[in-house]
Amino acid sequence: MTRPSRLRSLLHRSALLLAACASLAPAAHAAKPLLTFKVDDTVTARVERADREHITVRFLPSGKTQTLDVIAADEEGHYHLSSDDYNFDGHRDLAMHATLGMVNDSYGIYLYDPTRQQFEPLHLPASDMPHGNCDDLVNVVAKPKERTLYSSCRGGPIWYTDAYRFDASGKMYLYQSSEAIPDDLRDLLDADSGPSSMLLTYDAQGKRVSRRPDAYGGGAVTFKVRPARLPLHDAMNDAPTRRYVVAGDTVEVIDASADFQWLKVRYRNPHAGAVQGWVSAKEAMGN
């Protein structure tokens, strides 16, 4: 072979090699995983982008694949992926989340089903069951020691927190939520702290099992008595008893009527011990 022929052959082979590398590069880029995590000791999930509205999960070592909808994204279609054991069954699950507004990070969660060896969407409680203050799962935090999934969102000046648990069949139910206290009453109760609320607790069947005052950040709700004398009642709408608290006394709120017209309070008298009774919210506010 002459020297020019050898040169042409070398250039031809170089061109073919460059073309092959160029054709492989996009494929390699497309296969780059968005997230890889161990579901359990035997299964690894490799998450790849399928298109703008879908992702593909490849389970290793089986090689089985599953296509999932993108169920949480911002207005531009952006989202983040993370994994955690959101239902506390020993298997890590998959979450998509995106920031909507200034502080609310909206979540869409897929739970791993070890029997079917695939992910299934986590659903909020049915329409006939209690629902929380947040319309969806927001700013999600899983606390395995409590076996509770927390969702919190901001509405105006108030942060709301919904707590979810899972029943024996694995279905999620609302465990705790909060009920807002009227603004005029919060002025009395929240003089030295953030907004208090009523903490509502439910069982797995959706029955409310307790309702109690809860201070901002947790703890007892208290207020200082404003009127010179604030009479105590044995029951709402009963005539006042001979017992009363006086201006400057600090009392703890332990219950409230459904319309917040009456507050049940406890006062720890240094001489007579703890006394409790109902007071008129209107009288307590000095109105």
Model-derived features: where do they sit?
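Calcium-coordinating acidic loop motifs
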Residues: 85-87, 114
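SH3/SH3-like beta-barrel fold
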Residues: 248, 263-268
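Structural motif
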Residues: 103-109, 158-163
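Short aromatic loop motif centered on NTY/YTY
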Residues: 118-215
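Acidic/hydrophobic-patterned starts of short beta strands in beta-sheet-rich repeat architectures
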Residues: 87-98, 146-151
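Terminal domain-start segments
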Residues: 30-79
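SH3-family beta-barrel domains
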Residues: 188-231, 238, 244-247, 254-259, ...
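Bacterial N-terminal signal peptides
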Residues: 13-25
